[in-house]
């Protein structure tokens, strides 16, 4: 069985880890970094870039560079948060055929699961390169507060990337696993996870290898991206005040501002002031305009104060649901890059009444925890039991549009609950059941997971048929439904077909696209490699011709020069096989030159060789050099 990897699929950055023996290890990507930007871009010629290469070109290609895609995953186009996001990103958010939020570039639509799959593919390749073997299985993390649609969409992303997702695990729970793996002490911990796009808080009890989640809460649209946006808003307002120009309509300028805002935010975690300089940010009739201003930590904190405060209410709710007070928390673990901000640490300390634990790397701890869970599933990690919870209540719509809960939030998963339903009219042969997830009292205010019809009910007066519907939530937090007609004992397994989401056919098509793209990427990489090889050979051959050209015949030299010219012409095109053939021709033509170089180097390094060859005493191809032993004392005298 191959290795199971752990992947933290983040809003801003992603990370991959694997168990090596009893220890988890974060794997560096091809660029040598331990985290990879969750950014996917398409260039003018259709090439797909993932990670750092995509981030580097974002400023010049804002409409085809997709970032923070996790905020759209599993959301409908009409979701108010999708509409809010439309005003925050330079790329186009479009309505998918299934009503979900998709993104668009050059007239082609992509689902958020598909874009996320490209990042997961990069993580998969990173692991394969390190392990030297194919990887087909993974544990992927999601925010604890993700609903069923978001979890299902994440699982779909894994499938599109060619991964069997063995488990979807909550990010704070993964962090707790990583934190508690080597610690023998038991206690109650709070994991405060403020990442690039989402916020979660989980209360866990740890002891004797058991990690039991007591409660979880959060906000799936609160994170570092919002902090960056506040700085961008401030910069555009200041620039408009000073220059009278509105930069919010300029996508190129906005992308530069976003990069500068992120950089300034990071610097202000260690410095009390930073300078933002963006020359040639725009121009008007009077000429080019430059943006230059100082941003203090105090000003930055005032810009984002309400965002930091927004994290406290979920903490309060999580404590209440867990039935503990802040003073009963033994340790507060900080997760997510945004927790490096001093103000965040200050607010957390004030709320929990204790200094937060900073012994874990907030960018890597979630991937490490995912690798630990992968190790548990693979049997490499023993004596670890993880008991997670469902973050949201699950129920159905009943008479009058009321939300009737079947499974309450913070119920330990996997879990199962049955309820008997009946008909509302005489001889009714079908019932529509609408399944919702959320905490509001009216069904319409919660998230519709999907609906299904129970058909073929035998004719009977209303209220007589007994249909037992069983809801169960698996260890991934994903909902399944089974229905059984108690009269006939006939049972139906019903897969909730979400109102949006990807169908099996959609996923299959995207898997094929991903495979085709992987093949195209492989060919593109191969082309780059053969071109590099060809150019290196031309350079080396030309250098050799200038040094040893007089040692070969004019005909041989002419053959080499024409082979160089032919390879140069081939390098201007994109035919990898043609370039390989011309490279081979040049290698063949250069053989005489190689022989001359070898003979010359042999001659230089062998005293007496020239005399031996000139005298004609040896007829062999190999020239024997004369030698004589020299007495050491004699040598010193001569010297």
Swiss-Prot record:
Modification type Phosphothreonine: residues: 198
Domain of life: Bacteria
Low complexity composition bias: residue spans: 599-615
Entries under InterPro entries matching the protein: ATPase_NBD, Chaperone_DnaK, Heat_shock_70_CS, HSP70_C_sf, HSP70_peptide-bd_sf, Hsp_70_fam
Biological function: Acts as a chaperone.
A Pfam entry, by short name: HSP70
Cross-referenced PROSITE patterns: HSP70_1 (PS00297), HSP70_2 (PS00329), HSP70_3 (PS01036)
Name of the molecule in the record: Chaperone protein DnaK
Residues covered by region (Disordered): 599-639
Provenance organism: Methylorubrum populi (strain ATCC BAA-705 / NCIMB 13946 / BJ001)
Lineage: Bacteria, Pseudomonadati, Pseudomonadota, Alphaproteobacteria, Hyphomicrobiales
Molecular-function annotations in GO: ATP binding; ATP-dependent protein folding chaperone; unfolded protein binding
Coiled-coil blocks: none
Disulfide pattern: none
Family label: Belongs to the heat shock protein 70 family.
Induction: By stress conditions e.g. heat shock.
HAMAP family for the chain: DnaK (MF_00332)
Keywords: ATP-binding, Chaperone, Nucleotide-binding, Phosphoprotein, Stress response
Amino acid composition bias (Acidic residues), ranges on this chain: 623-632
């Amino acid at each position: 069985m191959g290795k199971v990897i752990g992947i933290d699929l983040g809003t801003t950055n992603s990370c991959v880890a694997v168990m090596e023996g009893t220890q988890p290890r974060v794997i560096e990507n091809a660029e040598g970094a331990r985290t990879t930007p969750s950014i996917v871009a398409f260039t003018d010629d259709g090439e797909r870039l993932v990670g750092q290469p995509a981030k580097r070109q974002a400023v010049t290609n804002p409409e085809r560079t997709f970032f923070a895609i996790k905020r759209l995953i599993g959301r409908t186009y009409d979701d108010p948060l999708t509409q809010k996001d439309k005003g925050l990103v330079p790329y186009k958010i479009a309505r998918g055929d299934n009503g979900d939020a998709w993104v668009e570039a050059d007239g082609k639509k992509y689902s958020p699961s598909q874009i996320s799959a490209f990042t997961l593919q990069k993580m998969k390749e990173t692991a394969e390169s390190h392990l030297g073997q194919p990887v087909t299985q993974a544990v992927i993390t999601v925010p604890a507060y993700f609903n069923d649609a978001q979890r299902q969409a994440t699982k779909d992303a894994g499938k599109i990337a060619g991964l069997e997702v063995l488990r979807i695990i909550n990010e704070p729970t993964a962090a707790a696993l990583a934190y508690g793996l080597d610690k023998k002490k038991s206690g109650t911990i709070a994991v405060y996870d403020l990442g690039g796009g989402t916020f979660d808080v989980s209360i866990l009890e740890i002891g004797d290898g058991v990690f039991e989640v007591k409660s979880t809460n959060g906000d799936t649209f609160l994170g570092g991206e919002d902090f960056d946006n506040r700085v961008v808003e401030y910069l555009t307002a200041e620039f408009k005040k000073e220059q009278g120009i509105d930069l919010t309509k300029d996508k190129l300028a906005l992308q530069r501002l976003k990069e500068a805002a992120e950089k300034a935010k990071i610097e202000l975690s260690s410095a009390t002031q930073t300078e933002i300089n963006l020359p040639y940010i725009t121009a008007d009739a009077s000429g080019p305009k430059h943006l230059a201003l100082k941003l203090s930590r105090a000003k930055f904190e005032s810009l984002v104060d309400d965002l930091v405060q927004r994290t406290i209410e979920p903490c309060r709710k999580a404590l209440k649901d867990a039935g503990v007070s802040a003073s009963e928390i033994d340790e507060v673990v900080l997760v997510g890059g945004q927790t490096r901000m001093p103000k965040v640490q200050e607010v957390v300390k004030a709320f929990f009444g204790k200094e937060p634990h900073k012994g874990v790397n907030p960018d890597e701890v979630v991937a490490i925890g995912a690798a630990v869970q992968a190790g548990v599933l693979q049997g490499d990690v023993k004596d670890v039991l993880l008991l997670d919870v469902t973050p949201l209540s699950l129920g159905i719509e009943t008479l009058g549009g009321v939300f009737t809960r079947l499974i309450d939030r913070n119920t330990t998963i996997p879990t199962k609950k049955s309820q008997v339903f009946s008909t509302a009219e005489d001889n009714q042969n079908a019932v529509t059941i609408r399944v919702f997830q959320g905490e509001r009292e009216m069904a319409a205010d919660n998230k519709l997971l999907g609906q299904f019809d129970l058909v073929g009910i035998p004719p009977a007066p209303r209220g007589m048929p007994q249909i037992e519907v069983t809801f169960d939530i698996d260890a991934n937090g994903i909902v399944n439904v089974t229905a059984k007609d108690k009269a006939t004992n006939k049972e139906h397994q019903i897969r909730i077909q979400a109102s949006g989401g990807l169908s099996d056919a959609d996923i299959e098509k995207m898997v094929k696209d991903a495979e085709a793209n992987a093949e195209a990427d492989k060919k593109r990489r191969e082309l780059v490699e053969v071109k590099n090889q060809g150019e290196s050979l031309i350079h080396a051959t030309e250098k050799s011709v200038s040094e040893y050209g007089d040692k070969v015949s004019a005909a041989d030299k002419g053959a080499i020069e024409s082979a160089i010219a032919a390879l140069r012409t081939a390098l201007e095109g994109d035919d990898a096989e043609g370039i390989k053939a011309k490279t081979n021709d040049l290698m063949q033509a250069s053989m005489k030159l190689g022989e001359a170089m070898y003979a010359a180097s042999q001659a230089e390094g062998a005293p007496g060789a020239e005399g031996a060859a000139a005298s004609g005493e040896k007829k062999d191809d190999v020239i024997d050099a004369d030698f004589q032993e020299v007495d050491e004392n004699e040598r010193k005298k001569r010297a």
